[in-house]
C-alpha cells in the first residue's frame, strides 16, 4: 500500500495502467459475484431456503461445518476485493468516502452474520438477500468513486481515511478469526484426540487417515490466503509505535504457516506433532487478536487527539 499513501498514480504511467487494470478486475469481480452468490447460496428466497434446509421433498438442514466453510470463503474474498478497491480512495478527495467504506463493510458483515440467524431461527432469509444486494450497490458505488477520482480529482493523501481503513481491517481480522475458530472446532476439533483422529483416522469412528492429495487440497489454497491476510495485518503494524513490532510481525507470518503445515507432520512424522498443531493454532488466534486490538487502540487514540 505504499503508493496509496505517498505515491502519485497519474504521474506514473506504468502505475496508472496497473491501477486501471485493477479497477477492471474489480468490475469483473463485482459482476461475477452475482453468479457466484447465486451458485453457492441463491439469489431468490426459494433457493436460499433450499441452501439452508434442503429441497421441500427431501428437507435436510445444512451442517454447521459446511455453512461455516462457505461463509468464511465468501467473507474473505469479498472483504479483500472491497478493501483493495476502497484503498484507492485514499488518494482522492471524494466526498462521503468514509461513510461509503463503513457502510460497505457493515453490510458485508451483517450479511455474514445473517447466515447464523437463519440457521438457528429458520427465519430472516429475505434479510440475507437484501444485505447482499446493499453490499453490491455500495461496492459498485465505491468503484464509480474510484474511477471518478482517478480521472478528475487531484491526488492528495488522506491520512484520516487511512486510519479508517486500518481500523476496519483490524475489526475484520477479529471477526474472521472467530469464524475460523468455529470452523476449526467443527471440522477438526479443539483437543488432542480430535486432531489425531482427523489426520490419522480412527477405525471406531470409521474415519480414514488423510491422504497426501487431501492434505495438499487444503494446504495449497490456504497458503496464499493466509500469507495475504497476515502479511496485510503485519504491514499495518508499521503505522503504529510499538517496541517489539518486528518480533510481532515475524510471528504473524511464521505461526500461521506452522499451523497450516502441521497436518503434514502429524500424518507422516507422528502424532506428537498434534501438540504443534494445537499450540500454533491457539498462538495464531492470540497474536491476531493482539495485533488487531493494538491497531484499533492506536486508530481510536489518534482520532481523539486529532
Curated annotation (Swiss-Prot):
Which cysteines are cross-linked by disulfides? Answer: none
| Membrane topology field | Multi-pass membrane protein
Chief location of this protein within or outside the cell = membrane
For whether the record's keyword set contains Transport, the answer is no
Keywords, ordered alphabetically: Cell membrane, Membrane, Transmembrane, Transmembrane helix
Regions crossing the membrane: 13-35, 71-93, 98-120, 130-152, 165-184, 218-240, 247-269, 274-296
Q: Quick check: keyword Transmembrane in the entry? A: yes
Q: Which GO terms describe its cellular component?
A: plasma membrane
Q: Where in the cell is it found?
A: Cell membrane
Protein name from the UniProt record:
Uncharacterized protein aq_1264
What is the species listed in this Swiss-Prot or TrEMBL entry? Aquifex aeolicus (strain VF5)
Amino acid at each position: 500500500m505504499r503508493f496509496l499513501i505517498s505515491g502519485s498514480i497519474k504521474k506514473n504511467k506504468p502505475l496508472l495502467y496497473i491501477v486501471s487494470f485493477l479497477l477492471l478486475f474489480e468490475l469483473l469481480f463485482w459482476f461475477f459475484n452475482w453468479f457466484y452468490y447465486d451458485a453457492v447460496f441463491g439469489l431468490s428466497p426459494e433457493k436460499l431456503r433450499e441452501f439452508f434446509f434442503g429441497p421441500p421433498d427431501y428437507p435436510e438442514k445444512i451442517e454447521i461445518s459446511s455453512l461455516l466453510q462457505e461463509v468464511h470463503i465468501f467473507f474473505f474474498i469479498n472483504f479483500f476485493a472491497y478493501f483493495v478497491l476502497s484503498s484507492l480512495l485514499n488518494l482522492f478527495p471524494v466526498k462521503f468516502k468514509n461513510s461509503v467504506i463503513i457502510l460497505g463493510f457493515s453490510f458485508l458483515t451483517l450479511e455474514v452474520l445473517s447466515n447464523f440467524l437463519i440457521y438457528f431461527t429458520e427465519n430472516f432469509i429475505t434479510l440475507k438477500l437484501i444485505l447482499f444486494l446493499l453490499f453490491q450497490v455500495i461496492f459498485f458505488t465505491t468503484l464509480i468513486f474510484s474511477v471518478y477520482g482517478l480521472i478528475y480529482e487531484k491526488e492528495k493523501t488522506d491520512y484520516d481515511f487511512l486510519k479508517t481503513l486500518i481500523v476496519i481491517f483490524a475489526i475484520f481480522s477479529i471477526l474472521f478469526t472467530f469464524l475460523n475458530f468455529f470452523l476449526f472446532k467443527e471440522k477438526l476439533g479443539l483437543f488432542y484426540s480430535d486432531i489425531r483422529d482427523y489426520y490419522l483416522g480412527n477405525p471406531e469412528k470409521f474415519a480414514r487417515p488423510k491422504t497426501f492429495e487431501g492434505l495438499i487440497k487444503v494446504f495449497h489454497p490456504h497458503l496464499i490466503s493466509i500469507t495475504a491476510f497476515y502479511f496485510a495485518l503485519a504491514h499495518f503494524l508499521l503505522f503504529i509505535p510499538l517496541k517489539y513490532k518486528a518480533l510481532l510481525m515475524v510471528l504473524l507470518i511464521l505461526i500461521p504457516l506452522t499451523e497450516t503445515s502441521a497436518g503434514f507432520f502429524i500424518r507422516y512424522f507422528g502424532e506428537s506433532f498434534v501438540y504443534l498443531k494445537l499450540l500454533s493454532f491457539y498462538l495464531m488466534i492470540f497474536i491476531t487478536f493482539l495485533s488487531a486490538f493494538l491497531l484499533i487502540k492506536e486508530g481510536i487514540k489518534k482520532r481523539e487527539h486529532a
